From Swiss-Prot:
Coiled coil: none annotated. Transmembrane segments: none annotated. HAMAP family: 16SrRNA_methyltr_A. The keyword Cytoplasm applies. Keywords: Cytoplasm, Methyltransferase, RNA-binding, rRNA processing, S-adenosyl-L-methionine, Transferase. InterPro entries: KsgA/Erm, rRNA_Ade_diMease-like_C, rRNA_Ade_Mease_Trfase_CS, rRNA_Ade_methylase_Trfase_N, rRNA_adenine_dimethylase, SAM-dependent_MTases_sf. The gene is rsmA. This is Ribosomal RNA small subunit methyltransferase A. S-adenosyl-L-methionine binds at residues 12, 14, 38, 59, 82, 107. One of its GO terms (molecular function) is RNA binding. Belongs to the class I-like SAM-binding methyltransferase superfamily. rRNA adenine N(6)-methyltransferase family. RsmA subfamily. One of its GO terms (cellular component) is cytosol. Its EC number is 2.1.1.182. Pfam families: RrnaAD.
Length: 268
């Protein structure tokens, strides 16, 4: 079968069988309900289907249907549509039993990695995600303070998930060969987060990193429309250096500051 790869969908197919098996092993999907994003020609799907309880895959390119023929298996369904545009709750109600927890697996198109990550965050049924992403993005997710890759996404993802680096993947392991290297990571959700606090945390972190060259003090002043003179007592009270930048602040400190900041705002 012949298929013309479509650049607009970021199609780069992984060809290394050993790595495909490693990804599935690390995902720990035996007898679990699985979502796959972008099955492509089915290289990963063929390994997942015999092991999983049920598989629901989203493939945007309907011309790949001939490669995704699983008529001999009654535990797999493929939706030919854009994952980002789907009402996942409706899909889950249709294909899975109520209150099912799901494991996500996939080689994510580089150009839509962040939107997919935020859709995973917003979908409580997804418990963990074993994903291949652009190495540069992966290094941001794994980055620690005082590292050039450390940003708002690093902090938010590390707050919401425990992150395991599985393997870096060289570009020559794909066909066609992409211009960048990749990395496989596993994200496991922290399910003990109150929705109200999460909303405040994301808002505080995003505003803290709003302009990277500015200090934390300047960013908070600009984004929350407060004078620096109003905010300085808050910094002094909580022993925060006035010249500190967001990329120097640890995840633990961001968590503590979020609580204190919104109390401070309510009192201001």
């Amino acid at each position: 079968m012949h298929h013309t790869n479509k650049k607009k969908y970021g199609q780069n197919f992984l060809t290394d069988v050993n790595l495909l098996n490693k990804i599935v092993t690390k995902a720990s999907i035996t007898d679990k309900n699985v979502l796959e994003i972008g099955p492509g020609k089915g290289a990963l799907t063929k390994i997942i289907v015999p092991q999983a309880k049920n598989v629901l895959a989203y493939e945007i390119d309907a011309t790949l249907k001939p490669f995704l023929n699983f008529e001999n298996h009654n535990n797999v369904n493929i939706i030919y549509d854009d994952f980002l545009k789907r009402d996942l709750l409706k899909d889950f109600d249709h294909y899975f039993s109520p209150n099912s927890q799901l494991s996500l697996i996939g080689n994510l198109p580089y150009y839509i990695t962040s939107p997919i990550l935020f859709k995973i965050i917003d979908t409580p049924q997804i418990n963990d995600a074993t994903i291949m992403i652009q190495k540069e993005v992966g290094m941001r997710l794994l980055a620690q303070p005082n590292n050039k890759n450390y940003n708002a996404l690093s902090v938010i993802i590390q707050f919401l998930f425990s992150i395991e680096k599985i393997q870096e993947v060289k570009r020559h392991m794909f066909f066609p060969t992409p211009k960048v290297d990749s990395i496989v990571i596993k994200l496991t959700k922290n399910n003990n987060i109150l929705p109200t606090f999460l909303k405040q945390f994301i808002k505080f972190v995003k505003n803290s990193f709003k302009q990277k060259r500015k200090t934390l003090l300047n960013n908070l002043s600009c984004q929350f429309l407060l004078s620096k003179e109003t905010i300085i007592p808050f910094f002094l009270q909580h022993h925060i250096p006035l010249q500190i930048r967001a990329e120097q602040v640890t995840l633990e400190t961001f968590q503590k500051l979020t609580v204190k900041w919104f109390i401070f705002l309510n009192m201001s």
